[in-house]
Amino acid sequence: MKSRDTLIRLKKFQVDEKRRRVAQIEGMIAEFERMAADLDREIKTEQERAGIHDPAHFAYPTYAKAAMQRKENLKRSADELKVQLDDARAALGEAFEELKKVELLDERDQARERAEENAREQADMDSIGLMRARLGAIA
């Protein structure tokens, strides 16, 4: 049983690690999306300030062009992280399934041990009852 308890603790630790990884990736994606939204606002502000909204225009603000490039890089990075997130979620699901298998085996073993203990107790009680019945018949 002790080895099973250790295995359960290990599986729980693995599930927790995978949950942390999923949360970390989700946080990074959210941060990249927030930064991209901030850059979007800055681009709009710069376009309004310059009065030019066409990126192909020769006088389009350089800062707005650079901000657009950074925004695209952030979106590309967020998309790459989404692939990693899918993988991390799949790994979390697998780790959770493994944990459940081990827990079910442990529950089954405990139920079997309880049934065996109950059977032993019942046998003891039966033998006590039988002895009392014999003593009562003798007396």
Regions found by a protein language model. Name each.
Residues M1-A139:
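Charge-rich amphipathic alpha-helical interaction elements
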